């Protein structure tokens, strides 16, 4: 068989000629003829797979290299299409210079130009030319820039229009206009171009030039960039894909929002118009309402001045008439006015406005404002409404959108991966071909060697020597460069992933050719052909290079490094000091490091294979492809041409005189020493601290110190760089990215130092901050996170461009449509003393800012402003489009990518797992030194301050020789850790390790319980005492040492437990053996598992002791009181419980133990905890006015304290100190009880007013934490959180470091510049105009009235800590406006700000929001979700050990088992009832009712506030009509269904709704008179319950049901998280009441929202759970004195002042936000994402819940008595009646017989047997089915115990065979009888003839039996002849013996029958 691709010498590209066209026509004709012929054979046609276009020959792709080089003369020329798919299409392809494919139609363009026409060919050549697309791209960009300018002459527009027209003409000439394949208008992107051009001409043609609408369409030109850049099209595809996927979520969201909007409409309509109005009755002194009085009253309540404004704002104060609503101050009344707040746009007055408000709530945009307004107007109890909307609406729906987008993204990713894998497979098959051929030839016995000689091997076009030359420099590069691999730049990464060369993140697919790490596989043959066989798989190469330098593992043994050998220390050393030896040298273990050998075992084509010429030639052709692929890769990899490479090698590798070499050696030693890295790291940290110490108002001495520090550090880092350059040579130094990074920073620092004298360059100073990132070298988490952000930015390159285009387009649209409106009407929305509003669209920059702000999620306020100045409809459409498109889709795609890079690049990647970095080595050495010193001191004082060490003295390897490899460092480090444990670093250790390093095929199985890497323990403090020395890391292969250590232990008798450790050992042994067996599979427990610390190997007494609490539970006896350590040190603690006094003590302990373990005791304690927590809620602001309550609380406080102390003492006695104090929950109890005890004692001793005691009293708020350990649900969540804490902390640290850079920049830019002069008039603070006050001295000078104050903005950048707070407000988008305005207005220190003086400072915040806010906050989501997934894997049950197939079966079966056939409701006998029954059970009836429910919902939407009396009347009538209809429906159903009506949940629901509706009608009539006392809104809401009935419709909508199913699945987990959140809120609200009851009312704190009572605190905390409005609550707490507050104001409880305490406030709010917003809310997201995935998987399974429901519903019709059986005759109809995948349409008799179903007497079949068979029919054959079937049968038998147990007596197949046999026998017998009668009536002429003819029946029967036995048997469970005893059926009897006997008796029967059948007839 010839090699499929041909060789590379020949080219596969052929010109497209008229002959080619003729060929195509012939093929098309042939195809049509074939089609006609096939039309007759329909069935075959269905089975045949339709051809599809080849993936790698798609348009815009490049054809793979193996198609050969493209000759220059064919560039841009029409060529025959390579893709077989297009062989029957009239098309041809054209390749440009970059080999990119374009396809064109071969028909005439515009009916004129054939493909061979000169004009068309020129047009084609131009259109595919790279310069053409470049020209168009540049034009578009220039045009975009032009559009951002406000005034541009029209002439420029004409130029652009002409260019676009020219482009369109060329494309139309080349492609044709629209009729044919690949024509101009067949590409949707060209529609865009076409519309842009057409609109431009229409705009010019019409005289209506004023239509700015048409001009806006020019903006669409920006979208043309998408059509020019190919990568963008893909991303847009993904976006469109995800928008499609969002359909279901959108429907669900609209439905939920509509329901909530209706509820809001009924509850709150008209309420927001209630305002505090001056009491005008007081004005009318006469008090009698004359007509004049009325006029005055009207005038009074209409006038703006008569509204009372909220202090500090210009908003009128809202109020309500309810008891818990907001109240008005004295002299004001609460009245309903005509306007709503916020320009009259915020209201619930009609459905549309309510819907907008609800949408705003869902997107959480300034929802705290709506929340406060509504609660103030309606009452605090309506907080419940907001809780529901925020948790169910906002969190759930918004996160569902995230889940859907993530899913769409992953699906597309998966598709790409599948594509790559398909490609790999083809290559693999290609490689296999020669081998198969070889086998065939060998089988034929042909001597292959004599067949061919390998002379004409078609080698690739580039000669081998050139390739060798090119590879050599790369070997040397590889030898020093750890990081440099083809994955370096994103382009290559994409290229490689396209070829399957992924970065090793994805598991290597089996036998993939393409998984290798470096492109130069230098396993060179003499002739330079790469042997493709030697690709050590990804894992192996990683193992190989684990402890040696990056490059070694791939180099073959034959190559010599071109670098000079040993005298040059740089020859083979990686920059981190890992020796990467020149190949061929020996690694330190004395073992040759040759991954070549390792790889050889996995070769596809080994070297010996190539010896035989015939095989070699075959392989060469394979190799030629492979090398070409590699070459392609190499070309993309090579950054510079060969001439530059040789230049670099010549001049950038410095080999001079021996002295220089000596200097290099010395420097090399210094630079690569681990301590050098430690020093550098410390310097970076200290330097960072120095930079963070800058602040406003530094003393000159402090400033000088910082300056000197800066110089010192700059010098240090410069020296480090110079040393490294000398030690490594520039050539190698600059190949590491870190070094380039260092070099840039050092250079910038030097420039800054030089320039500092001339003037401060604060911009350059910020560059020094980037040094922080150098920490990433030694801090894996930071490294990983930077990588994640890097990966995302790489992958997001295209997405970022799309986002930029969206922002750009919308900013332009806004500017074009609304710019003039903003200019003309700006007075409507700007502040009184400002020229322009802050946010407008008059120029491009401000327009961009508005769009950016919408993307941040703040759209509503700008939209109100826009609606004030422009057309309302345009504003609504524009803002909502940006919001939905930009915010929801694009930002979610970002998040999806971030999450994706998390799953790809785990926080513990293998790279960090195996590699020990120098920092850890240095720390290990220090630790070892510390141990030695400690030991020496102990020996010196010779007293047992510590337990004696084990005897074996370790030989420490501390001084590492210069040439040491990383392996040795690793060993040294391990020795350093292991040394105190007494492990000697023996030869065995070295050998084992070397073996592990050099032989990648050794499996190292590590027990799951051990830490992530051998050196994790180093990260703990170095103070392990002797107890933990056994837990030290024990190296692989050291079990014998461990056993010795174990045996060396003495096990003292433990006095408490009554049995010694040895006694326990046997008990434990048994217990743990089982555990070990259970764990084995989890540990991959094969024989090769060499788990060092496995418990089974040796029972460590300490382990036993650690397990004692568990055993104690089993033994029902208390533990020891003290730990073993205490007993050893204080022998007096040992007691003998058999002696007198201790016996009594032991009995007491046992009694206490029983009390404490009793469930009632626990319940009592929980009750007490709840009561004591509840009592804390009463200690509020008003407590001093309630002396009785106060006294009661004091008394109960003492009581609770006594009870808890008693509980603690009981537990001490019962559990012993050891168990009590080793339990974290007990510690928590202990601390909280102590706090209560101390505060109680202080109170008794009259010290309660001391500040520290007061602080302690506030800590009593922690009491509810004790409930945590008692409630299982919360405990689970807390455990999960605690598990996530390490990674959350890691991310938090990284975020802090990221933010540190921005904070320091902020300090550099804004320190001290936020000061301003304000004028305090009444409660309102206004900025003094710049014309009056210019600076701080003016402010003091002008202060005649004493109302001028020079103040600083409360949240500022005066120091780094304050900067962090400012950044937190910016990142959460709360309070960021004030900070931003201050920054933009700031001029300089002590100068009065000027409006937008520094407008481009906005960009500082934009950049921070993108990197600091967006990335880092999303990293939290990523980390938390990632962490939960890992925890789930650890705790995972059977799912992890199940294949995907098994899971599908398992889930299908799970659903099966839970269902059983139900009896249908019998039809009533009474004919009237029967008639109604028929109506009610028809589907049409249900549909009519549904339509009515929808109509009812619509009529409810029509209601508005202040509607006319007429409308109210009509709506009431309609409402009564609907109530009547639904009542009628209810009555009819009850009449027809009798008592069965209440068996259906939906019916009960309907019944309740009807009763409530009637009730509300009756009440509303009665209560019209009492309306003042009782609000009928509640009854209105009850009517809404009807909407719930719409949910019944949802059964039809599968997608939406999946989403609701996901919600139902999430509910338990969400409830637990909600409980935990409530607990946190409870604790914080009590803290708040204790700390901030007296703060002044301003910003977010007022008479309703404050920390004075428990209820008010909860209102505030619920609001900031979503981080909304926390800046407003924090603002008054930051006040420290005038003008904002008065520290001497007396308070009700005797304390003074209404100022806050900033430190406590900041701590309180930041911790609460981190806990609630970042953690709890993110857990919510994690749960929803998880369950959404599960739900989608379930819904995408071939069989869903509905299919089984449908099965049983159909079954009910065939089995009305619910006997669980139907007759065989009914089966065919039944199978045909089913719907969905289970249906088997008629004719189905044969299929059903083939299913071989068991029959019971009466020819009946059991429902479960049918269901199994049908399920098997859908899912196909599988081994797992049988075991699952057994489970389901058990379940089913348990739930449906039938009275009689039916035994199957046959199966359908056997029944059919018997049936056929019977017919045959009957026929034969009849013919025999007939024959016989004939012979009797006509006696034969020849008497002997009868003997000659055999009786016909014998032959017949024999033939028929044979034939029937050979009937095809699909099921393989029962054969035609017999029943095997193992046959499973539901209907089987209970015991196995019965089964055996029945089947054997059947067998006997069988044999009997067959004998009878084959016996000759009479």
UniProtKB/Swiss-Prot annotation:
Disulfide bonds: 276-328, 866-875
Chief localization: membrane
Tissue expression: Expressed in nodose ganglia, but not in cortex, hippocampus, cerebellum, liver, heart and skeletal muscle.
Location(s) in or outside the cell: Cell membrane
UniProt repeat feature IV, residue ranges: 1465-1764
Intramembrane sequence windows: 351-375, 844-864, 1361-1382, 1654-1676
I repeats: 116-414
Residue numbers spanned by region Disordered: 32-56, 452-493, 521-586, 1015-1035, 1914-1962
Spans of repeat III: 1147-1456
Segments forming domain IQ: 1858-1887
Family: Belongs to the sodium channel (TC 1.A.1.10) family. Nav1.8/SCN10A subfamily.
Role summary: Tetrodotoxin-resistant channel that mediates the voltage-dependent sodium ion permeability of excitable membranes. Assuming opened or closed conformations in response to the voltage difference across the membrane, the protein forms a sodium-selective channel through which sodium ions may pass in accordance with their electrochemical gradient. Plays a role in neuropathic pain mechanisms.
Protein name listed in UniProt: Sodium channel protein type 10 subunit alpha
Gene name of this polypeptide: SCN10A
């Amino acid at each position: 068989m010839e090699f499929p691709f041909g060789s590379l010498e020949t080219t596969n590209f052929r010109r497209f000629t008229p002959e080619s066209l003729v060929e195509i026509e012939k093929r098309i004709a042939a195809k049509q003829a074939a089609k006609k012929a096939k039309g007759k054979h329909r069935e075959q046609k269905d089975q045949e797979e339709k051809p599809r276009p080849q993936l790698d020959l798609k348009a815009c792709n490049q054809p793979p290299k193996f198609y050969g080089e493209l000759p220059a003369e064919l560039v841009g020329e029409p060529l025959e299409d390579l893709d077989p798919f297009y062989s029957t299409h009239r098309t041809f392809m054209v390749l440009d210079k970059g080999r990119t494919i374009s396809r064109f139609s071969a028909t005439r363009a515009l009916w004129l130009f054939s493909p061979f026409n000169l004009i068309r060919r020129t047009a084609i050549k131009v259109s595919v030319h790279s310069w053409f697309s470049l020209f168009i791209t540049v034009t578009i960009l220039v045009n975009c820039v032009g559009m951002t300018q406000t005034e541009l002459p029209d002439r420029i527009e004409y130029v652009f229009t002409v260019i676009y027209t020219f482009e369109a003409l060329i494309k139309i000439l080349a492609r044709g206009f629209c009729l044919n394949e690949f024509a101009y208008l067949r590409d949707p992107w060209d529609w865009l171009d076409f519309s842009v051009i057409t609109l431009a001409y229409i705009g010019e043609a019409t005289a209506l030039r004023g239509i700015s609408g048409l001009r806006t369409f020019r903006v669409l030109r920006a979208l043309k960039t998408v059509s020019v850049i190919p990568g963008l099209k893909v991303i847009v595809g993904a976006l469109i894909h995800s928008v499609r996927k969002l359909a279901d979520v959108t429907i669900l969201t609209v439905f939920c929002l509509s329901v909530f909007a209706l509820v809001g409409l009924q509850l709150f309509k008209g309420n927001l118009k209630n305002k505090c109005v001056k009491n005008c009755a007081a004005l009318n002194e006469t008090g009698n309402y004359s007509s004049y009085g009325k006029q005055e009253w009207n005038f009074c309540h209409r006038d703006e001045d008569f509204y009372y404004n909220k202090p500090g704002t210009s908003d009128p104060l809202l109020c309500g008439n309810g008891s818990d609503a907001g109240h008005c101050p004295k002299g004001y009344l609460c009245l309903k006015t005509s306007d709503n707040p916020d320009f009259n746009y915020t209201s619930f007055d009609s459905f549309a406005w309510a819907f907008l408000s609800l949408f705003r709530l869902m997107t959480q945009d300034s929802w705290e404002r709506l929340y406060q307004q509504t609660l103030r107007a309606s009452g605090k109890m309506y907080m419940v409404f907001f809780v529901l909307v925020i948790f169910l609406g906002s969190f759930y729906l918004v996160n569902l959108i995230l889940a859907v987008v993530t899913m769409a993204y992953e699906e597309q990713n998966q598709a790409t991966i599948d594509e790559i894998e398909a490609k790999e497979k083809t290559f693999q098959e290609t490689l296999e071909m020669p081998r198969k051929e070889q086998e065939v030839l060998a089988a034929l016995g042909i001597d292959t060697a004599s067949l061919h000689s390998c002379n004409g091997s078609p080698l690739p076009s580039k000669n081998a020597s050139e390739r060798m030359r090119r590879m050599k420099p790369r070997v040397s590069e590889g030898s020093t460069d750890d990081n440099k691999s083809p994955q370096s730049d994103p382009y290559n990464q994409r290229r490689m992933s396209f070829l399957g060369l992924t970065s090793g993140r994805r598991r290597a697919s089996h036998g993939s050719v393409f998984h290798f790490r470096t492109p130069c596989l230098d396993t060179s043959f003499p002739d330079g052909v790469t042997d493709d066989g030697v690709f050590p798989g990804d894992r192996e190469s990683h193992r190989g290079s684990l402890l040696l330098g990056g490059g070694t593992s791939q180099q073959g043994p034959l190559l010599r490094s071109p670098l000079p050998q040993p005298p040059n220390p740089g020859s083979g050393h990686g920059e981190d000091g890992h020796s990467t030896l020149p190949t061929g040298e020996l690694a330190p273990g004395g073992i040759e490091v040759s991954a070549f050998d390792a790889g050889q075992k996995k070769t596809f084509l080994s070297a010996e294979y190539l010896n035989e010429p015939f095989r070699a030639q075959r392989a060469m052709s394979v190799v030629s492809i492979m090398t070409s692929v590699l070459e392609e890769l190499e070309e993309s990899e090579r950054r510079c041409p060969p001439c530059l490479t040789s230049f670099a090698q010549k001049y950038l590798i410095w080999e001079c005189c021996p002295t220089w070499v000596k200097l290099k050696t010395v420097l090399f030693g210094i630079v690569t020493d681990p301590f050098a890295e430690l020093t550098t790291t410390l310097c970076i940290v200290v330097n960072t601290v120095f930079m963070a110490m800058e602040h406003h108002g530094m003393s000159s001495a402090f400033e000088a110190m910082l300056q000197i520090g800066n110089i010192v550090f700059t010098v240090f880092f410069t020296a480090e760089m110079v040393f490294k350059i000398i030690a490594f040579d520039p050539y190698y130094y600059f190949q590491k990215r870190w070094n380039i990074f260092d070099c840039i920073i050092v250079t910038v620092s030097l420039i800054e130092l030089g320039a500092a004298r001339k003037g401060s360059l604060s911009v350059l100073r910020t560059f020094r901050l980037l040094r922080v990132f150098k920490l990433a070298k030694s801090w894996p988490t930071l490294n990983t996170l930077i990588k994640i952000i890097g990966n995302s930015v790489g992958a997001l390159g295209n997405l970022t461009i799309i986002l930029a285009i969206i922002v750009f387009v919308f900013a332009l649209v806004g500017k074009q449509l609304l710019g003039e409106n903003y200019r003309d009407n700006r007075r409507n929305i700007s502040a009184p003393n400002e020229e322009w509003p802050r946010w407008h669209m008059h120029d491009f920059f401000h327009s961009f800012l508005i769009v950016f702000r919408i993307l941040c999620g703040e759209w509503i306020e700008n939209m109100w402003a826009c609606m004030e100045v422009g057309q309302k409809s345009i504003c609504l459409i524009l803002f909502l489009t940006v919001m939905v498109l930009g915010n929801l889709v694009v930002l979610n795609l970002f998040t999806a990518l971030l999450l994706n890079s998390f799953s790809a690049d785990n926080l513990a990647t293998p790279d960090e797992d195996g590699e020990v970095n120098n920092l850890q080595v240095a720390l290990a050495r220090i630790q070892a030194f510390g141990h030695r010193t400690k030991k020496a001191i102990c020996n010196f004082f010779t007293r047992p301050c510590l337990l004696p060490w084990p005897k074996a003295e370790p030989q420490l390897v501390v001084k590492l020789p210069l040439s040491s490899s990383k392996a040795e460092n690793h060993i040294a480090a391990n020795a350093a850790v292991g040394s105190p444990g007494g492990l000697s670093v023996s030869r065995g250790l070295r050998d084992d390790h070397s073996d592990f390093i050099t032989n990648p095929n050794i499996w190292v199985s590590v027990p799951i319980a051990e830490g992530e890497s051998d050196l994790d323990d180093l990260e703990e403090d170095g103070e392990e005492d002797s107890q933990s020395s056994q837990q030290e890391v024990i190296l692989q292969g050291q079990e014998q040492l461990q056993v010795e250590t174990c045996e060396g232990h003495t096990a003292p008798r433990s006095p408490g437990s009554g049995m010694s450790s040895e006694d326990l050992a046997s008990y434990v042994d048994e217990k743990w053996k089982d555990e070990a067996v259970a764990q084995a599979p989890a540990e991959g427990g094969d024989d090769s598992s060499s788990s060092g610390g496995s418990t089974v190997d040796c029972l460590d007494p300490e382990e036993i002791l650690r397990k004692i609490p568990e055993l104690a539970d089993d033994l029902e006896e208390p533990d020891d009181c003290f730990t073993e350590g205490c007993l050893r040190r204080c022998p007096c603690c040992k007691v003998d419980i058999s002696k007198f006094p201790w016996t009594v003590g032991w009995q007491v302990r046992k009694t206490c133990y029983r009390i404490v373990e009793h469930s009632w005791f626990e319940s009592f304690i929980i009750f007490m905890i709840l009561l004591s927590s509840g009592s804390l809620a009463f200690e509020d602001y008003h407590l001093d006015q309630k002396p009785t309550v106060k006294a009661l609380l004091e008394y109960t406080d003492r009581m609770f304290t006594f009870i808890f102390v008693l509980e603690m003492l009981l537990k001490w006695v019962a559990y012993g100190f050891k168990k009590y104090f080793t339990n974290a929950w007990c510690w928590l109890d202990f601390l909280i009880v102590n706090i209560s005890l101390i505060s109680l004692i202080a109170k008794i001793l009259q010290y309660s007013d001391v500040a520290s005691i007061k602080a302690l009293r506030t800590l009593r708020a922690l009491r509810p934490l004790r409930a945590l350990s008692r409630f299982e649900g919360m405990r689970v969540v807390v455990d999960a959180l605690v598990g996530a804490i390490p990674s959350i902390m890691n991310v938090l640290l990284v975020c802090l470091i990221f933010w540190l850079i921005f904070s320091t920049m902020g300090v550099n830019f804004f320190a001290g510049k936020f000061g301003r002069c304000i004028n305090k008039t009444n409660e309102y603070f206004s900025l003094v105009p710049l014309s009056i006050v210019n600076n701080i001295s003016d402010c003091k000078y002008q202060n005649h009235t004493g109302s001028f104050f020079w103040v600083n903005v409360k949240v500022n950048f005066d120091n780094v800590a304050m900067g962090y707070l400012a950044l937190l407000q910016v990142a959460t988008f709360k309070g960021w406006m004030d900070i931003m305005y201050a920054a933009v207005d700031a001029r300089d220190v002590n100068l009065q700000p000027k409006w937008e003086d520094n407008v481009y400072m906005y960009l500082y915040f934009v950049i921070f929001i993108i990197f600091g806010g967006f990335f880092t906050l999303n990293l939290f989501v990523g980390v938390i979700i990632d962490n939960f997934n890992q925890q789930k894997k650890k705790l995972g049950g059977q799912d992890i050990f199940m294949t995907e197939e098994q899971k599908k079966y398992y889930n299908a079966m799970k659903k099966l088992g839970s269902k059983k056939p139900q009896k249908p409701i019998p039809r009533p006998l009474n004919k009237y009832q029967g008639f109604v029954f028929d109506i009610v059970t028809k589907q049409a009836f249900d549909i009519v009712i549904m339509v009515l429910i929808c109509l009812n919902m619509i009529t409810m939407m029509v209601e508005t506030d202040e509607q006319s009396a007429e409308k109210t009347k009509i709506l009431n009538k309609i409402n009564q009509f609907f109530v009547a209809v639904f009542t009628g429906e209810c009555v009819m159903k009850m009449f027809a269904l009798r008592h069965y009506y209440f068996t259906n949940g939906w019916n009960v629901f309907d019944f309740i709704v009807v009763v409530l509706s009637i009730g509300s009608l009756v009440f509303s009539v009665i209560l019209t008179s009492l309306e003042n006392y009782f609000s009928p809104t509640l009854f209105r809401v009850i009517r809404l319950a009807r909407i719930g009935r719409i949910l019944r419709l949802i059964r039809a909508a599968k997608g939406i049901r999946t989403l609701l199913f996901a919600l139902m699945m999430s509910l338990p987990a969400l409830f637990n998280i909600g409980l935990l959140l409530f607990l946190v809120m409870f604790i914080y609200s009590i803290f708040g009441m204790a700390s901030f009851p007296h703060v002044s009312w301003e910003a977010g704190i007022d008479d309703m929202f404050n920390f004075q009572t428990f209820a008010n605190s909860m209102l505030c905390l619920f609001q900031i759970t979503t981080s909304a409005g926390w800046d407003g609550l924090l603002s008054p707490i930051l006040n420290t004195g005038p003008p904002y507050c008065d520290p001497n104001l007396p308070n009700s409880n005797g304390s003074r002042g209404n100022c806050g305490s900033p430190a406590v406030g900041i701590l309180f709010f930041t911790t609460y936000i981190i806990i609630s917003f970042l953690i709890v809310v993110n857990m919510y997201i994690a749960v929803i994402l998880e369950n959404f995935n599960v739900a989608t998987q379930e819904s995408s399974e071939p069989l869903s819940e509905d299919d089984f429901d449908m099965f049983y519903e159909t079954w009910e019709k065939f089995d009305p008595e619910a006997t669980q059986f139907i007759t065989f005759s009914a089966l065919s109809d039944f199978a045909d009646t089913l719907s969905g995948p289970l249906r088997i349409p008629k004719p189905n008799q044969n299929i059903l017989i083939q299913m071989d179903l068991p029959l019971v007497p009466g020819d009946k079949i059991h429902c479960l047997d049918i269901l199994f068979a049908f399920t098997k029919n859908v899912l196909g054959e599988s081994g797992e089915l049988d075991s699952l079937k057994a489970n389901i049968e058990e379940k089913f038998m348990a739930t449906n115990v039938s009275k009689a147990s039916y035994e199957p007596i046959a199966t359908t197949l056997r029944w059919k065979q018997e049936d056929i046999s019977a017919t045959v026998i009957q026929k034969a017998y009849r013919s025999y009888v007939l024959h016989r009668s004939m012979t009797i009536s006509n006696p034969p002429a020849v008497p002997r003839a009868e003997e000659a003819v055999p009786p016909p029946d014998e032959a017949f029967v024999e033939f028929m039996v044979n034939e029937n036995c050979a009937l095809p048997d699909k099921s393989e469970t029962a054969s035609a002849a017999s029943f095997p005893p193992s046959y499973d059926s539901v209907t089987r009897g209970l015991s196995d013996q019965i089964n055996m006997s029945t089947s054997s008796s059947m067998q006997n029967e069988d044999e009997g029958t067959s004998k009878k059948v084959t016996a000759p007839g009479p």
